[in-house]
Amino acid sequence: MKKFILLGLLALGACAQPGAPPACTAPLKPAVEINLYFGRDKPGGGEVSDTEWAAFLNDTVTPRFPDGLSVLNVEGQSRGASGVSRERTKLLVVVVFDAPAHQARIAEVVAAYRSRFGQHSVFRSEQPVCAGS
């Protein structure tokens, strides 16, 4: 059930566009922070292992975002018909300066994870930020 809830949230998120770019002070520039939440529970039982995740990151994610990304270990939870369920999750954070140009790459990563690990959804959020180094 939690997968269907996340799928619904993903669908809603796909309809929303990030807000207007913030007014940034130099050297920062307007950008978009994209967060993808990859649940690690497999539908038939078990979990996406650290080795499986590392392979996915290396062969699917990194080639699409070679300029950099961050991965955090988080504990996700959702409420379904049977109550609250908890799941270990990988949070992928990517900051991009041209969000429309990266939408296909994001979609490819999400589709690859869903296919490779039998997931129903990957939750996604986006927000305008100021970024730079």
Residue ranges and their predicted role:
Residues 16-18:
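Bacterial signal peptide processing site
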Residues 52-89, 95-101:
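Mature extracytoplasmic domains of secretory-pathway proteins
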Residues 1-4:
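Positively charged n-region of N-terminal signal peptides that target proteins for export
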Residues 21-26, 78-82:
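Short beta-strand/turn micro-motifs at beta-sheet edges
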Residues 84-133:
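Helix-rich interaction surfaces within compact, conserved domain-sized segments
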Residues 31-50, 93:
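Terminal, regulation- and interaction-focused segments at domain boundaries
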